[in-house]
A protein has these predicted regions:
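Alpha-helical transmembrane segments that form the membrane-embedded catalytic/substrate-binding core
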Residues: 143-154
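Alpha-helical transmembrane segments and their membrane-interface boundaries
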Residues: 1-118, 122-134, 144, 157-168
Length: 168
């Protein structure tokens, strides 16, 4: 919690310039957490039920990454459209601003969900490799890592695209 709060504090200037991005922080964090936890559960189940070869582990990583990317693309595209319309119609922003912000949110969702699915797969594999029960050790770590990934992805994209490139 303290580490994630410190990282959010590093992006204070982004929130000060674009307060609207704060409204959608929980969307990014929650979806990244959901995807990471799902990948974690699938991976732990597979690791406990089967003796996997290196090739099967690589296949599992790519499978979970595809799932995370697919879900991210679907939710990211929906977010671009729905949040863009919401900002435009209810927050009285220009059309360009509304869809720039929603595009940033959509991109952050795609990236955060992809990275979180990879992290949710790789962390239990690491613990399994070093003979620590991944079911016990992975939970707290995956939550913190996914929150960090989501915060850095979201506010990093907001800073880079919305402030540095588009100058909002």
């Amino acid at each position: 919690g303290l580490v994630v709060s410190s990282v959010v504090g590093m992006f204070e200037h982004v929130v000060a310039e674009l307060t609207i991005v704060m409204c959608f922080q929980s969307l990014i964090l929650d979806m990244a957490g959901n995807v990471g936890t799902q990948s974690l559960a699938v991976t732990i189940r597979v690791l406990m039920d089967e003796n996997l070869t290196a090739g099967q582990k690589v296949h599992l990583v790519f499978k979970e990454a595809r799932v995370g990317l697919s879900n991210g693309l679907i939710l990211g595209m929906m977010s671009i459209i729905l949040i863009g319309c919401y900002i435009y119609f209810f927050k009285s922003g220009s059309l360009q601003f509304a869809f720039a912000v929603s595009g940033c949110i959509g991109a952050a969702l795609i990236l955060a969900m992809l990275i979180s699915s990879l992290v949710g797969t790789l962390i239990p594999m690491f613990f399994h490799k070093i003979h620590i029960d991944p079911a016990v050790a992975s939970g707290p770590l995956i939550t913190t890592v996914n929150d960090l990934v989501a915060v850095v992805t979201y506010y990093g994209l907001a800073w880079f695209f919305l402030i540095e490139i588009l100058h909002y």
